[in-house]
Design a protein with these regions (language model features):
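The substrate-binding groove and active-site-proximal loops of carbohydrate-active enzymes
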Residues: 7
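Short SAM/SAH-binding signature in class I
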Residues: 1-4
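C-terminal substrate-binding/active-site "lid" region of AdoMet-derived donor-dependent transferases
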Residues: 10-105
Length: 105
């Protein structure tokens, strides 16, 4: 399991995904925290380098697009594919990581 929660800019999180997501074992997770930034009012991130359109969720969307369009290999040599696991979001009801629970399939 890999948990990403540092700088929240799109480029930084995308780079983290490229580096660390390939380490995730099949059936395990890459969790990207604070994807909810995309859904916040601009005023909540006014003093930050991230905000709507430039955040962890947009990086997740871009990374999944790259996986689909370009493909990637995992560290174990298998194809790297992730699905959103909404069962976690539904169980906990409130989360800072909508679209951020990525299960390797």
């Amino acid at each position: 399991m890999v948990l990403l929660d540092s700088n929240h800019t799109h480029e930084h999180v995308l780079a983290e995904l490229e580096l660390y997501a390939p380490l995730v074992s099949k059936g395990s997770y890459c969790v990207v925290w604070d994807t909810g930034v995309e859904d916040l009012p601009d005023s909540m991130c006014a003093d930050r380098p991230w905000g709507k359109g430039n955040n962890p969720k947009t990086a997740v969307w871009e990374y999944r697009r790259r996986l689909k369009d370009e493909g990637r290999k995992a560290r174990d040599g298998g194809a790297l594919n992730f699905d959103y696991d909404y069962t976690i979001e539904h169980k906990i009801a409130i989360t800072a990581a909508p679209d951020g629970f990525l299960k390797r399939v």
